[in-house]
């Protein structure tokens, strides 16, 4: 589809908080395959805090540039918890689509869950529900998670001729759209501390709004070591982010990089795997927030003590401990073998 007058109507709908740059990219990237965009915004964040109507104000000044964008206001007053606000927003958005765009395909996903153009094209005219694949990237467009988030697929495509689903179908078991390029989930994609702070404060995951996660020292630490800022040492990938070089960008990443090159990290971290594992251990300990770990993280930050000291010295100690444990294990295996042979 090249224009809003195309026979097949496709609507892209998503809730938004304050991510103007990423929203602008999503609109421009999908404009050739989507007829209309609907953005749901509220004066209350999912965490329950009062917020500015960023998108209503931004688009009001640019209505002539974006006649194919509609901003709808969602009243979240009276809702008592973060997840109720998130679900209500998504279902309000779904109700609006069904009442406004008859016989139309639609996308409902979070703003940072962006489908590829080929995913949208593959669904045009199809009267069915699907999830679409959006592997997760943290903080930069080319730092990919390697745990279960690599198979992230919570976004939904459907058709208004179908029955509405709870929560916009986000957690409904639906077939996965295959045979096309992946989209991308650009989570926490921000330029600086201020944007990261705002993301945490507005997030439905209120348990993650910890002061230590919003310090410059902490963010520099996780960026330099290219580790998950939520830790996840005990999960697949051990909280280590995978660096994707420019030559391996997919179409969506290339387009985003062309528009906002500072959303990409230039090079792979120079720290070794052992150093990065230790960094992931430190972050996991801090985020899990046992009392001692929180006191330790506060000490490092309040004293402006460099966490790099730990990352450079401890790997040597860690390596020694691992070697020692390995040697013990080998001796135990030899001992067991000898005992087994002697019994035989």
Give, region by region, the residue ranges found by the protein language model.
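Short beta-strand-to-loop acidic/aromatic patch adjacent to the donor-nucleotide binding site
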Residues: 102-114
